[in-house]
Amino acid sequence: MKRLSRSAAPVALLLAAVLLSGCYSTGIDQYFSPPQPSEEYLQLQELIDKELSSGSEYAAPTRGSFRQSVQFTDLDGDGMEEALVFLRGADGTPKINIYLSVNNEYRKVLTLDGEGRSIGSVDFADLDTDGRTDLIVAWQLTGSMSLLSVYSLENWSGELLLSTDSTEYLTGDLNSDGREEILVLRNVSTGTYMADMYTLRPDREPQAASAALSSGIYGLQRLRMVTLADGSPALLAESLLDNGDLVTDVLSWREGSLVNLTLNRSTGISETRRSYSLVYAQDIDGDGVVEIPHPQQLYSQGGELFWSVAWYKYDAFGRAGLDMTTYHCVTDGWYLELPDGWATGLTVRRVDDVPGERAVILSRLGTDGSVHDLVAIYTITGENRIDRARLEGRFLLQEESSTVFAGQVMDNSVDPAAIESRFHRIYSDWSV
């Protein structure tokens, strides 16, 4: 996907530096000259001002990577940047003006009039492999529904290549043909979502392939391209079901069709469905392949429920293989890769009776119902956190600005070094 070389706020902001005043003495000021906007930018601003004076207003895209009212990029591959200006017209409908610079002077070459009340998002990709960038625009119709339009910029024609309803979309090479496709998720009816893959033939005629997502979806959570265990690309969509469960749909291109690899044909819901909805699919081991979480409820020592998470890799035929099992403490922001054999009979309890200190104790449940403690993980805050992390029997796992994590082995067969190497922090990931 082609990305912008740079982005800009409305061009008028370029003049702000001229108006800034400092606290330097006159003797120092004489050696400094505030940056001056070029005549080219001033002339572009004049063109934009004409639009604004006619009743238009800036209307930047509300989602996605490109959210500035004015964006600069080389759309036609000539090495020169064009300016895209995102506006709302006097009638309230959104529009996009494209300005071309010729001999250091801008002129408007294209206006794209949209639908709805705003511009949801924009993106850029060469979908027909003609060497030119195509413009992808999601015109926002309602809170969750967009009209997705793809425009050719050849000779600045603005030819509409594709138009379809969309809830979310992205671009990627799902069929491994070296060309990018548009992958669209759309809400067909309440609880029913479809995934559509659009390709553009050499004659620019769109071709579509579709597959159903899990039934009963309440709302989409995350969407991205991932790599499967056999190296195949896949589209991964994670959603909340209407009962609060989390589900992961994995879609792949197989034998000329778009296939939902994880969908159970009997239930109409992915086999990745889980009531523990705090952990999302990710590359948990850092090998470049996505793993899908399958939580397993642990034996409860009290009222609070705890879960271990088995992580599975999938290939393009939907075959799954266990990669690892973890215990995720989302509350304290860490997880532990469980050593071999720990997942069977594991039980967990939390102890937080010491101010500024929370302990999570992982134990093994005996066949007679007895509990044998293995290791404790401490999350410690407060001014004396370092001292408490180094109390007798404890070892430091990780130190951050206001929090320290420490461990304590409670079984002689457990190696502290193994716990240290298996301890990881939980960091925020992507979202739709």
Language model: regions and residue ranges:
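Sec-dependent bacterial lipoprotein signal peptides
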Residues: 1-21
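A short acidic-to-branched-hydrophobic micro-motif
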Residues: 364-384
